[in-house]
């Protein structure tokens, strides 16, 4: 056990985590040069296309150190985006140490801090690594000072490497072996294994990634899931060297995969403890704290026949992504679907793409909303995650919106622009600290504004230099209203949005104008209105298509023309009474862009 090292690689987006993992795999001979490819651990097509890591991946390698000993390295490559920070904290729970990778050109950014603090809270040994020293813009001395100044860990002798060229990566491994402690645990005690991650394989059923904390797990053992009390047979187990390799046992301190022929998706939840059925452990390991979704949206299959397969797909996906929340929902405009909760807009986009790709579904998404806390006049507190569930205005005593605490790190030059943006987003400044050339800003901004497009606009006002990390702080009373959209005097529930009263006029007008461009013209006028309660705040009309009924009157009497026009008018009236309007998918997506164009 003393030769096992478990560690994660954490860093801000694009600081070179996945490339560093590639080099480590190559040096330790996990894959031959022929099988090697860039970002070998990003196995999902979506990850490769976007060049980001979405799922944490684990690998077991052997490394012969300079002291002549051979060490077993179990390491986990983690995502860098704020939306996937839950993946990071789960990966860290399986480790004793973390490599904090910092780009020697960019320096410390917001996620660097957030991930590093997560690791420190779990009492992990953090080893700083300066990456990308082959870049002409690299300034390792300045960045080492920044790490000490902002993060507060000693970085004077931080290892310098370039994951792309492979310079200094061996030094990183030597430092790892020296600084990260071996796993603790009792190899002879009763088995306790923590499920870090699971996914669904069509042939094997549920595959789980486990970290053995105490005891040993052997092939063929009877294994008990502690939360459900169900027992299974350990059919196959092994490690990833990125490839799946079968083993006969997993020893104390190791990380590996396990197949127990569990067909039920809820059979082995992430964060659960496995123990042996013969000699069970007394208590379960502390799991992970459940994360609360920040953004909710309705997902509906385009054709209602897909509802069943959509439900199965969500089940399989939620096994792989424990932060996804869903419950059935029906809408008069869109039929049956699910209300899903996500950690952020990127997460929502990724889930939608994965459902469409991996499970071949066509989906319509409604506008994302955050959760509001509503106190009714009957003094009940309810949580509303969809505008259609908001009680009528006269039943609401107080409506509170979620406030996010946003930590931003940016160069001084962009401070003015960023502050202007935060004020526009109804933000309140709570802290500002200068670190050399960098400024650390803390603002409290309503979550609804953050999830809309705050991140994109922060990046564009600061030319990509600012970085953001946010978390939910509290609920705060505020003057929010629901803007309904009426089409031919009928409310369309899927188009409603909740917004601040100050913005409601402009948002309503903008939404109505957008809808006017998107709804195809019909044989009769379509009135599109935005309303708060019964008060109409904006209207526009999609003009009817009409035939020129006077074309056949050559010259002719005015009363003849009037008669023909009158007859056409009557016909249109009748049509309008029975006609219904089909809304295209783009119309539902229009809400996503409300408030984005008026920059």
Curated annotation (Swiss-Prot):
Required for accurate and efficient protein synthesis under certain stress conditions. May act as a fidelity factor of the translation reaction, by catalyzing a one-codon backward translocation of tRNAs on improperly translocated ribosomes. Back-translocation proceeds from a post-translocation (POST) complex to a pre-translocation (PRE) complex, thus giving elongation factor G a second chance to translocate the tRNAs correctly. Binds to ribosomes in a GTP-dependent manner. GTP binds at residues 14-19, 131-134. It is a peripheral membrane protein. The keyword Cell inner membrane applies. It comes from Salmonella gallinarum (strain 287/91 / NCTC 13346). InterPro entries: EF-4, EFG_III/V, EFG_V-like, EFTu-like_2, G_TR_CS, LepA_C_sf, LepA_CTD, LepA_IV. It is found in: Cell inner membrane. Residues 2-184 form the tr-type G domain. It catalyses: GTP + H2O = GDP + phosphate + H(+). It holds the Pfam family GTP_EFTU. GO terms for cellular component: plasma membrane. PROSITE patterns: G_TR_1, G_TR_2. Its EC number is 3.6.5.n1. GO terms for molecular function: GTP binding; GTPase activity; guanosine tetraphosphate binding; ribosome binding; translation elongation factor activity. HAMAP family: LepA. This is Elongation factor 4. One of its GO terms (biological process) is positive regulation of translation. It is an enzyme of class 3 (hydrolase).
């Amino acid at each position: 056990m003393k030769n096992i090292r478990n560690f994660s690689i954490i860093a801000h987006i694009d600081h070179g985590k996945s490339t560093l993992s590639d080099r480590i795999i190559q040096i330790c001979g996990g894959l031959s040069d022929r099988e090697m490819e860039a970002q070998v651990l990003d196995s999902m097509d979506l990850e490769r296309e976007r060049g980001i890591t979405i799922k944490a991946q684990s690998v077991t390698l052997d490394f012969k150190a300079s002291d002549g000993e051979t060490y077993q390295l179990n390491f986990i490559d983690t995502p860098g985006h704020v939306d996937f920070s839950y993946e990071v904290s789960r990966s860290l729970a399986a480790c004793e140490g973390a490599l904090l990778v910092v780009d020697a050109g960019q320096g410390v950014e917001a996620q660097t801090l957030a991930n590093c603090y997560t690791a420190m809270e779990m009492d992990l040994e953090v080893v700083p690594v300066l990456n990308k020293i082959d870049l002409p813009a690299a300034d390792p001395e300045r960045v080492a000072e920044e790490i000490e100044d902002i993060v507060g860990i000693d970085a004077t002798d931080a290892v310098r490497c370039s994951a792309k060229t492979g310079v200094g990566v061996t030094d990183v491994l030597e430092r790892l072996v020296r600084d990260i402690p071996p796993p603790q645990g009792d190899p002879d005690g009763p088995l306790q294994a923590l499920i870090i991650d699971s996914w669904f394989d069509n042939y094997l059923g549920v595959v789980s990634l486990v970290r053995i904390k105490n005891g040993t797990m052997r092939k063929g053992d009877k294994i008990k899931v502690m939360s459900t009390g169900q027992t299974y047979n350990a059919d196959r187990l092994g490690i990833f060297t990125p490839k799946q390799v079968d083993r006969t046992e997993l020893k104390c301190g190791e990380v590996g995969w396990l197949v127990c022929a569990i067909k039920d998706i809820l059979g082995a939840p992430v964060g659960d403890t496995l123990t042996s059925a013969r000699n069970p452990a007394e208590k379960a390991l502390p799991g992970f704290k459940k994360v609360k979704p920040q953004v909710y949206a309705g997902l509906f299959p385009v054709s209602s026949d897909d509802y069943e397969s959509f439900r199965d797909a969500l089940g399989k996906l939620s096994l792989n992504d424990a932060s996804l929340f869903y419950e059935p929902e029906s809408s008069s405009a869109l039929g049956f679907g699910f209300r899903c909760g996500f950690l952020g807009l990127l997460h929502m986009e990724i889930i939608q793409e994965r459902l469409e790709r991996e499970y071949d579904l066509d989906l319509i998404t409604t506008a994302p909303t955050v959760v509001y806390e509503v106190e009714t006049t009957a003094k009940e507190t309810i949580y509303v995650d969809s505008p259609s569930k908001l009680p009528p205005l006269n039943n609401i005593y107080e409506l509170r919106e979620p406030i996010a605490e946003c930590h931003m790190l940016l160069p001084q030059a962009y401070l003015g622009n960023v502050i202007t943006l935060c004020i526009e987003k109804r933000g309140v400044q709570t802290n500002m600290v200068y670190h050399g050339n960098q400024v650390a800003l803390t603002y409290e901004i309503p979550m609804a504004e953050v999830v809309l497009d705050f991140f994109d606009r922060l990046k564009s006002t600061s030319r990509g230099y600012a970085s953001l990390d946010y978390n939910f702080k509290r609920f705060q009373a505020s003057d929010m209203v629901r803007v309904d959209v009426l089409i031919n005097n009928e409310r369309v529930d899927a188009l409603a949005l909740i917004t601040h009263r100050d913005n409601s006029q402009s948002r309503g007008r903008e939404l109505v104008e957008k809808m006017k461009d998107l709804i195809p013209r019909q044989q009769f006028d379509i009135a599109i209105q935005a309303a708060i309660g019964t008060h109409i705040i904006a209207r526009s009309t999609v003009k009817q298509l009409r035939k020129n009924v006077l074309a056949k009157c050559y010259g002719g009497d005015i009363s003849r023309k009037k008669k023909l026009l009158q007859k056409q008018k009557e016909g249109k009236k009748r049509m309008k009474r029975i006609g219904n309007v089909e809304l295209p998918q783009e119309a539902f997506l229009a809400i996503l862009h409300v408030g984005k164009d008026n920059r």
